[in-house]
Amino acid sequence: MSMLCYTLIIAFLIGIWAVPKSEDNAPLGSPATSDLSDTSCAQTHEGLKTSRNTDQRHPAPRSQRIKQFGSASNIIVDPKLFQKRRFQSPRVLFSTQPPPLSRDEQSVEFLDNEDALNRNIRAKRETHPVHNRGEYSVCDSISVWVANKTTATDIKGKPVTVMVDVNLNNHVYKQYFFETKCRNPNPVPSGCRGIDSRHWNSYCTTTHTFVKALTMEGNRASWRFIRIDTACVCVISRKTENF
C-alpha cells in the first residue's frame, strides 16, 4: 500500500514539473525575452544601416555638419565645477548674453570692484578737470570681450581646445575672456610716449597672463590655465653711445 502511495506522489510531482511555463512570467534570459531583444537589436541594426546608406547617398551640407559638431561639443557641465573660488577669474565670464559695451562702443566695461573704483575716480576728474596738466598713457591699449576663443596655449606651452559654449542646468552659456592688447606698438614715431628718445629705445608690447578656463580634455570638460592678453606695456633699452 505504501509503495502505491509513493508511486502516485512521484507521478503527480513529475506531472507538475512537466507543465510549460507561461511567457508572461518568463524569467530574464528566457526565450520569450531573448527573442524580443534579438528582434529589437535586429531592427536597430537595420535602421542604423539604412541611415548610414542614406547619409552616404545624400551627405549633409557643410553648414549642417558644422552645426552638428558644435552641438556635439556642447557638453553638459556639472554645476559643482563653479563652486570653487580658486577656479574663478575676473577676466573670465560665463553669460547667456554679451557683456555690456561702453558708451562709445569701442571699449568694454570691465565689471570689477577695482575698475568700479577707477571709474569713480575718472568721473571725479571729469567733474573737476585740471586744465594746466595733461594726462597721457605711455602706450595706447584696447580692451575687448573675446567670445569665440576656440584654441589657446596652456601653462605648459601646449595647445588646448577652449569650450565656447557651456551647457549648465539646461542653459547654454558662452565663455567670454576680457583681453587687453596694444593698439599700436609705436604710438609716437620714437616709440613709447613720454620716453626720451635721445637716450632710450622704446616700443609698446602686449603682455600675457594665465587664467582658469573651461577646456576640452577628450570628451570631458576640465579647468586649465590658458594664456590671454592682459596689458600693454612699454619696453625700453638704453642706447649705446658711440665714441
Curated annotation (Swiss-Prot):
<comment type="similarity">
    <text>Belongs to the NGF-beta family.</text>
</comment>
<comment type="subunit">
    <text>Homodimer; non-covalently linked.</text>
</comment>
<keyword id="KW-0446">Lipid-binding</keyword>
<dbReference type="GO" id="GO:0008021">
    <property type="term" value="C:synaptic vesicle"/>
</dbReference>
<keyword id="KW-0800">Toxin</keyword>
<dbReference type="InterPro" id="IPR020408">
    <property type="entry name" value="Nerve_growth_factor-like"/>
</dbReference>
<dbReference type="GO" id="GO:0043524">
    <property type="term" value="P:negative regulation of neuron apoptotic process"/>
</dbReference>
<dbReference type="GO" id="GO:0030425">
    <property type="term" value="C:dendrite"/>
</dbReference>
<dbReference type="GO" id="GO:0048812">
    <property type="term" value="P:neuron projection morphogenesis"/>
</dbReference>
<dbReference type="GO" id="GO:0005163">
    <property type="term" value="F:nerve growth factor receptor binding"/>
</dbReference>
<keyword id="KW-0339">Growth factor</keyword>
<dbReference type="GO" id="GO:0021675">
    <property type="term" value="P:nerve development"/>
</dbReference>
<keyword id="KW-0325">Glycoprotein</keyword>
<dbReference type="InterPro" id="IPR029034">
    <property type="entry name" value="Cystine-knot_cytokine"/>
</dbReference>
<dbReference type="InterPro" id="IPR020433">
    <property type="entry name" value="Venom_nerve_growth_factor"/>
</dbReference>
<dbReference type="GO" id="GO:0007169">
    <property type="term" value="P:cell surface receptor protein tyrosine kinase signaling pathway"/>
</dbReference>
<dbReference type="InterPro" id="IPR002072">
    <property type="entry name" value="Nerve_growth_factor-rel"/>
</dbReference>
<keyword id="KW-0732">Signal</keyword>
<keyword id="KW-0964">Secreted</keyword>
<protein>
    <recommendedName>
        <fullName>Venom nerve growth factor 1</fullName>
    </recommendedName>
</protein>
<dbReference type="Pfam" id="PF00243">
    <property type="entry name" value="NGF"/>
</dbReference>
<comment type="function">
    <text>Nerve growth factor is important for the development and maintenance of the sympathetic and sensory nervous systems. It stimulates division and differentiation of sympathetic and embryonic sensory neurons as well as basal forebrain cholinergic neurons in the brain. Its relevance in the snake venom is not clear. However, it has been shown to inhibit metalloproteinase-dependent proteolysis of platelet glycoprotein Ib alpha, suggesting a metalloproteinase inhibition to prevent metalloprotease autodigestion and/or protection against prey proteases.</text>
</comment>
<feature type="propeptide">
    <location>
        <begin position="19"/>
        <end position="125"/>
    </location>
</feature>
<dbReference type="GO" id="GO:0008289">
    <property type="term" value="F:lipid binding"/>
</dbReference>
<keyword id="KW-0646">Protease inhibitor</keyword>
<feature type="glycosylation site" description="N-linked (GlcNAc...) asparagine">
    <location>
        <position position="148"/>
    </location>
</feature>
<dbReference type="GO" id="GO:0090729">
    <property type="term" value="F:toxin activity"/>
</dbReference>
<dbReference type="InterPro" id="IPR020425">
    <property type="entry name" value="Nerve_growth_factor_bsu"/>
</dbReference>
<dbReference type="GO" id="GO:0038180">
    <property type="term" value="P:nerve growth factor signaling pathway"/>
</dbReference>
<dbReference type="GO" id="GO:0050804">
    <property type="term" value="P:modulation of chemical synaptic transmission"/>
</dbReference>
<dbReference type="InterPro" id="IPR019846">
    <property type="entry name" value="Nerve_growth_factor_CS"/>
</dbReference>
<feature type="disulfide bond">
    <location>
        <begin position="139"/>
        <end position="204"/>
    </location>
</feature>
<dbReference type="GO" id="GO:0008083">
    <property type="term" value="F:growth factor activity"/>
</dbReference>
<dbReference type="GO" id="GO:0030424">
    <property type="term" value="C:axon"/>
</dbReference>
<keyword id="KW-0165">Cleavage on pair of basic residues</keyword>
<keyword id="KW-1015">Disulfide bond</keyword>
<dbReference type="GO" id="GO:0008191">
    <property type="term" value="F:metalloendopeptidase inhibitor activity"/>
</dbReference>
<dbReference type="GO" id="GO:0005615">
    <property type="term" value="C:extracellular space"/>
</dbReference>
<keyword id="KW-0483">Metalloprotease inhibitor</keyword>
<feature type="disulfide bond">
    <location>
        <begin position="182"/>
        <end position="232"/>
    </location>
</feature>
<keyword id="KW-0481">Metalloenzyme inhibitor</keyword>
<feature type="disulfide bond">
    <location>
        <begin position="192"/>
        <end position="234"/>
    </location>
</feature>
